[in-house]
């Protein structure tokens, strides 16, 4: 499958005429990525992650929390994301959707303050799970 002809031409025009906006957005994503990485290193040093090299998301390794979910029919990354959504109101993607059940995918497309609030809630859930376990 491929984008429609109209979408392809719109993409060409965007690439020709949106250089300043592209640079501005790239800088904003870099700032958010750096803020997320700094937060994770400071607030969740016991949880590793795959540092992004150009995407607008990162993968957080939750494999150490696997036993917190016991027997289940769904992948534990899905169980974690559902718990995070239901209890902390933060939406992330389960790594199982990308063939990486030991991870969750965190997008940093939201503004920096929203991103850091969400990461704080992830930190809180991780700490709660470790206390319960």
Predicted features along the sequence, with ranges:
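PLP-dependent class I/II
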Residues: 1-133
């Amino acid at each position: 499958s491929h984008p429609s002809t109209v979408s392809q031409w719109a993409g060409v025009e965007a690439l020709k005429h949106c250089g300043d906006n592209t640079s501005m957005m790239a800088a904003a994503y870099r700032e958010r990525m750096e803020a997320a990485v700094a937060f994770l290193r400071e607030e969740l040093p016991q949880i590793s992650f795959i540092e992004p090299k150009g995407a607008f998301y990162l993968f957080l390794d939750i494999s150490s929390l696997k036993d917190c979910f016991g027997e289940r029919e769904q992948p534990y990354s899905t169980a974690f994301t559902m718990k995070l959504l239901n209890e902390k109101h933060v939406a992330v993607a389960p790594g199982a959707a990308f063939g990486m059940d030991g991870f969750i995918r965190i997008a940093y497309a939201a503004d920096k303050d929203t991103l850091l609030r969400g990461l704080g809630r992830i930190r809180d859930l991780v700490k709660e799970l470790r206390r319960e376990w």
